[in-house]
Regions:
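Helix-to-loop junction immediately C-terminal to a conserved catalytic motif
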Residues: 3
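Conserved ABC ATPase "signature" region
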Residues: 56, 63-81, 133-134
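Conserved catalytic motifs of ABC-family nucleotide-binding domains
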Residues: 107
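ABC ATPase "signature
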Residues: 171-172
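Conserved ABC transporter NBD signature motif
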Residues: 11-19, 28
């Protein structure tokens, strides 16, 4: 809803107090980075091209594009050689790191994560969770995550919101909700 891929059945969607409309949705998208469960990568593009696609569309120079992608690869611990591969040639953890890089490419104000660990095996999940927590703390960004895993919610969030039928049922710290 926030990035305009789905229209609300009723009501309205606002970001930073501003109503999201078809006319301004692209401006809102530039302020939000998002990662979906399977990464949402384009299979016919290399990892590097997947990350830089929007920035290239916005007119970034080749030098700026490569510098930012290399910076994000270091931040997410994605091996340099992985940038030249296609998504099908990458592990699940590498694809998620790539999705995170793409979300961070334009230095968004807000980062949305939709089940970012859902398809990963436990060892990859643990490594990626540790890395993500460090990354998000260092960037000092607002991060919202959708997850069915309460432990994951508590690991990442200082505030957890439980939803039921599209409404807030409870909110607080994980410790508060467990009590």
């Amino acid at each position: 809803l926030l990035i305009g891929l789905i229209e609300p059945d009723q009501g309205e969607v606002r970001f930073q107090g501003e109503l999201i409309t078809p006319e301004n949705v692209m401006l809102v998208r530039r302020k939000i980075g998002y990662v979906i469960q399977d990464g949402g990568l384009f299979p016919h593009l290399s990892a590097r091209d997947n990350v830089g696609l929007l920035a290239k569309y916005l007119g970034w120079s080749k030098t700026r594009l490569h510098e930012r992608i290399d910076e994000l690869a270091g931040l997410t611990r994605l091996p340099a050689e992985a940038l030249e591969r296609y998504p099908a040639q990458l592990s699940g953890g590498q694809r998620q790191r790539l999705g995170i890089m793409r979300a961070l490419m334009l230095n968004p104000e807000v980062i949305l994560l939709d089940e970012p660990m859902g398809a990963l095996d436990p060892l990859v999940r643990f490594d990626l969770q540790e890395d993500l927590r460090k990354i998000f703390q260092s960037l000092n960004k607002t991060v919202a995550m959708v997850t069915h895993d309460m432990g994951e919610a508590g690991f990442f969030g200082d505030r957890v919101i439980l939803l039921g039928s599209g409404r807030i049922v409870q909110e607080g710290t994980l410790d508060d909700l467990i009590r």
